[in-house]
Each structure stands twice: as structure tokens, then as C-alpha cells.
Amino acid sequence: TNTGSSSTLDVTVTPVNDAPVAVVVAANGAEDPAQGIAVKLSATDGDGLANVKSFTVGTPTNGTFYTDAAMTKPVTGSIDAVNGEATIYFKPNENFNGTANFTYTATDSGNADGSNPLTSAPANGTVTVTAVNDAPEAIATTATGTEDPSVGIAVKLSATDMAGLAHVKSYTVGETANG
């Protein structure tokens, strides 16, 4: 039998900072864009999305990241997060198509007093760039011959095309000087 008295015990749990978790991201767009391909970085944090302070992005394969869609400000250092997200813009290398890979991390603002900020493990990101039909490029040529020939002077026309020579379907010849 219990003959003792009851009592109340107060337990105080002091919260500790939990590291954010950077989320795997994927984006896509066409090669040689006029505006950058938007890539949304994202992270979760057990302490709340507002606690995610910034992202740090690694160098992507086959292109460059910018902080603006006009692609005038390359990403350097960290990028501020708003509610666990930030958008950067990818410019693929000229005529690149395929998958560009990168990694990034998220950093939080730490404990309530700002101490002990934590960084997530790296998350993977991909940007899939689709090919577009590039215009062929004419190759300058010259031809020489004698004045007043009985038959015309042969001129070889040639061009290059990123998709292969089979894609060059026709040539248009304008007026010639002196002839």
C-alpha cells in the first residue's frame, strides 16, 4: 500500500537547434535561353521554415548560375532564403543540351540567441536542357576564273549545322557584285 503523498514535478525541456534539410530539386528548359532557367532551391527545418537563412550552391556542370533571370549577376557566396526557398537562374553553356548537375546546402539561423547555426548535408540538383534547332551557318567561299568564259565559273557552296550537314536543305544565292 502506498502511504506517501503526491507531488508535482515540473520538467523544462530546452530546445536545441536542428539542422535544416536541403531538398533534391530539378528544373528544365531549352538550350540558349534569352532568360535563365529558374531553379527553386528548397529546405525544411524542424525549427520552422523561417529559420532557414541561406543556401550555398556548388558550381553546376555545363553552365553558370545567376541571381537574376536576365543573367547579369552570377551567384557568389550564399543566397538569402525566404520561408525556406530561393530561386536562382541557370544559363547553359552555348549549344549545350542534356543534364547539368549541382549540389547545394541550406544553413539555418541557429539557436534563439543566434549561436550554433547548422548546415544541411548536400542535396543534389539537376537542370535538364532540351535541344533546339540551331540555324545553319554559311561558310564564306571565293571563286576565280577568266573574263567572258564560255561556261560559268563554278562556286562551291557550303555550310555547317549543329544538327549535322543532312539538316542543310537548301542555299539561297543573292546578287553578285560584277557579274
Placement of each model-derived feature along the sequence:
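C-terminal edge beta-strand
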Residues: N2-T14, A112-V132
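Extracellular ectodomain surface segments
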Residues: S5, V16-P60, Y66, N93, ...
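Low-complexity "stalk/linker" and mucin-like segments enriched in Ser/Thr/Pro/Ala/Gly
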Residues: T61-G84, A177-G179
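Surface-exposed, short loops/turns at beta-strand junctions within beta-sandwich domains
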Residues: V82, E94-G98
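Exposed beta-strand face motif in extracellular beta-rich ectodomains
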Residues: A86, G98-F102
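Exposed aromatic-hydrophobic patches
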Residues: T87-K91
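Conserved structural position at the C-terminal beta-strand
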Residues: P92, A106-D108
